Amino acid sequence: MIIKPRIRGFICTTTHPVGCEANVLEQINFTKAKGKIANGPKKVLVVGSSSGYGLSSRITAAFGSDAATLGVFFEKPSTETKPGTAGWYNSAAFDKFAKAEGLYSKSINCDAFSHEAKQKAIELIKQDLGQVDMVVYSLASPVRKMPDSGELIRSSLKPIGETYTATAVDTNKDLIIEASVEPATEQEIADTVTVMGGEDWELWMQALSEAGVLSDNCKTVAYSYIGTELTWPIYWHGALGKAKMDLDRAAHALNTKLSVTGGSANVAVLKSVVTQASSAIPVMPLYIAMVFKKMRAEGLHEGCIEQISRMFNERLFKADGTAADVDESNRLRLDDWELREEIQQHCRDMWPQVTTENLAELTDYREYKEEFLKLFGFGVEGIDYEADVNPHVEFDVVSI
């Protein structure tokens, strides 16, 4: 079929398999050009490995450290009338390129919150790898099906305490608007912590530990974002922030356990990037368009793969073997460049000035839109989008 982009709300409902493969290859080539990670991991489990930071983590481990990787995700293959999800094609491309280099690659397509996902991962690790020396937890899901009761819990992207009103961009109409978001109820806050907090990360690590599939020096990392006062009302001081604070709680608990055998658990605070997850958060697209323009001008711009490469090389697996630099809460900070005062001051100055008319001039909004489409395999250089492509892509994946 010939596949064109179709946008609905915060997602593109179509995907291009060849474009997705090209995106993955671009990240692989970046990783290879960086050279090998000195003390990198060799057997890695990535929970949430099909897009964004999770995919970049899998690529960095495999192509930067020759690691065997097991990826867990929840994606949809193609049907007779519809292409598969971008994460399906990303994972298929990763599998193809990893196997071509003789690297172990297996994937599990399932609900990562379920007991079954954990048991299947343990089974494959025991069967193929013995143990893993790194676990990356990178789930971004709006819903969690509770593994025991089957109850569906939903997260909320809302402020706490009072209605939040701010200048934002309507990404469908390319208009500057005033966005208002009602505050979360106590129940919505609790539910957001249940879905996006640290509990499931702990359950994964507990299951892996009890099964004896964690090596003595196993490192685990989960991803977070803090930002600044520009986004705090909707993010760090909102319901989502409470969940991310719970991730910190989980990291401390896990670190206490893992450090006994020379392992570690950290939250890595990353910069804002264009992902399917961030595009759904009110105000984030406008902030990202602003901050990207300034960071590009300063030569500090990074996407997912650059961030994760820096985390592996300069934080977790330093060439000199020394411990990672952490903040006062034991977090790895990769948002350091974004948080530089001159970058943030630029955004503070720009925010009141942005209008629909000057949006493209004052910010990198055009580039934001291009990057958003690229997530789904569109607008990638060198791809013929008029060509007939086969949407049915199979690979080494166990579906539960």
Curated annotation (Swiss-Prot):
Under which pathway is this protein filed?
A: Lipid metabolism; fatty acid biosynthesis
InterPro entries (alphabetical): Eno_Rdtase_FAD-bd_dom, Enoyl-CoA_Rdtase_cat_dom, FabV-like_NADH_b, Trans-2-enoyl-CoA_reductase
Name of a matching Pfam family: Eno-Rase_NADH_b
Site entry (Plays an important role in discriminating NADH against NADPH), positions: 75
> Per its record, how is this protein called by name?
Enoyl-[acyl-carrier-protein] reductase [NADH]
For this chain, the family text in UniProt reads: Belongs to the TER reductase family.
Q: Quote the PANTHER family the UniProt record gives.
A: ENOYL-[ACYL-CARRIER-PROTEIN] REDUCTASE [NADH]
**Subunit structure, as described in the record:** Monomer.
Reaction it catalyzes: a 2,3-saturated acyl-[ACP] + NAD(+) = a (2E)-enoyl-[ACP] + NADH + H(+)
GO terms under biological process = fatty acid biosynthetic process
Sites where the protein binds substrate = 225
What functional role does this protein have?
Answer: Involved in the final reduction of the elongation cycle of fatty acid synthesis (FAS II). Catalyzes the reduction of a carbon-carbon double bond in an enoyl moiety that is covalently linked to an acyl carrier protein (ACP).
Q: Which domain of life is it from?
A: Bacteria
Keywords (A to Z) from UniProt: Fatty acid biosynthesis, Fatty acid metabolism, Lipid biosynthesis, Lipid metabolism, NAD, Oxidoreductase
The reply on keyword Lipid biosynthesis is yes
Q: Name one GO molecular function term.
A: NAD binding
